[in-house]
Amino acid sequence: MICGSKTKSYLKSQNLKILGQGKLNGIVEISGAKNSALVLLASSLLTNEKIILENVPFLTDIEKMGNILKNLGVNLVRKNNQLEIDPTTISIKELPYELVKGLRASFFCIGALLTKFGEAQVPLPGGCNIGSRPIEEHINGLIALGAEIIIEKGIVKAKIRGNKNRLHGTHIKLNCPSVGATETLIMAASLAKGRTTIENAAREPEVQDLCQMLNKMGAKIYDSGKETIIIDGVNKLGGCTHKVIPDRIEAGTFLIAAAATSSSITISPVIPHHLEAVTNKLQESGSKITIKGNSISIKSKEIKGVDIETAPFPGFPTDLQAPFTTLMTIANGESKITETIFENRMNHIYLLNEMGASIKLNKNVAHIKGVKTINGMNLVGSDLRSSAALIIAGIIAKGSSNFYGLEHLDRGYENFELKLKNLGVKIIREISKNTFEENGYKIESKSENLSKLGAA
């Protein structure tokens, strides 16, 4: 039987087959941060000069953003993990719905297009189905900067108010430290006239990475990484070469996978202080963490239950709540997981319970009693991070599991199963010739293996 919401239907050509109770051993090369690369791509719209981005991961979300830029007229050339971006050929300021419907980060483009060209039209965004992620903070901030905005038939239409040709600096206080709103408003303010102050700004590393790149381009942004960011608008921005920071969420996912399997691995390159909230909790749960330069090593045996509560950076990241929940299912004792960022990010718990976990869910709080083992089964991921959590569950489970929903996983993890295989996990990506329907799902059968199970 396959479990999950019966309201959804999956008909995909690939799935992962996982043999459980595996161990991890070795070194993991961490990719560039997806959430940073996406906003850096959007920020390239602010200049008329070439941008070179290094350490850009191969992900479907990156491909979607690239297609959005190409549709605007931007010329993109990829050489391995390097992207050369030439925005001098931009010809339109409107984003088509068919390109943005599955990518929430597409909305970042509105701030850049508006401040550079004086107008922009961007459909309301899509992305992971993890609850409401409203854009009111973006809209209110742009209005404060001098934009006139209307929303018609799902399209946000923005232009600079009156006869002015530039946005104007202002003071903005965000109701919550929204990463997306902070990034959108930083881009818009970078070419505005005068000083903009953003209070209660997001402090995430990805925001800091954006500010560092914009400053390389000639922006004047101060105090990124603090609760109040100051931007002095400039007349124009130039080109630059910038290396995307390592993906702290991917790094944390592998650390949690190692802890869940009582394994020892090293991850590199990373920026250790970006992961401090995660490594502190892993240490509290019984793992030994060693930091050396830009690498982190973990050695884990028995895990004990600990409580976590998600919070904006530097707190425990919401994107690692689901993987950490999987870890706690087999921990000694009890634990409590509290999700404070998104209201619909606990879907993985139902599947974990089907595998044999003991979790009671009360709204946004999961109460977990650790069990000795969970059992493999057919699994369906409903979003990016729950997919990673369920794959970790398949690795620690007794027996085999089939994971469906790779369209979610491939949005944010570069070569995930290959990296796991290199660590010793017995996992393969299968391609299917036929399908059958069970419990409301189209399930693949008669699969052809893309790689040998357990091969490095």
Curated annotation (Swiss-Prot):
InterPro entries in the cross-refs: Enolpyruvate_Tfrase_dom, Enolpyruvate_Tfrase_sf, MurA_subfamily, RNA3'P_cycl/enolpyr_Trfase_a/b, UDP_GlcNAc_COvinyl_MurA
Signal peptide boundaries: none
Residues given in the record as UDP-N-acetyl-alpha-D-glucosamine binding sites: R104, D319, I341
Residue positions of the active site: C128 (proton donor)
Enzyme class: transferase
EC number annotated for this UniProt entry: 2.5.1.7
Binding positions (phosphoenolpyruvate): K34, N35
The reaction(s) this protein catalyses: phosphoenolpyruvate + UDP-N-acetyl-alpha-D-glucosamine = UDP-N-acetyl-3-O-(1-carboxyvinyl)-alpha-D-glucosamine + phosphate
Residue ranges the record marks as coiled coil: none
Compartments reported by the entry: Cytoplasm
Top-level lineage group: Bacteria
Record keyword Transferase present: yes
UniProt keyword annotations, A-Z: Cell cycle, Cell division, Cell shape, Cell wall biogenesis/degradation, Cytoplasm, Peptidoglycan synthesis, Pyruvate, Transferase
Keyword Phosphoprotein: no
GO CC annotations on file: cytoplasm
MF (Gene Ontology): UDP-N-acetylglucosamine 1-carboxyvinyltransferase activity
Residue(s) carrying 2-(S-cysteinyl)pyruvic acid O-phosphothioketal: C128
Family recorded in the similarity comment: Belongs to the EPSP synthase family. MurA subfamily.
Name of the protein in question: UDP-N-acetylglucosamine 1-carboxyvinyltransferase
Native source organism of the sequence: Prochlorococcus marinus (strain AS9601)
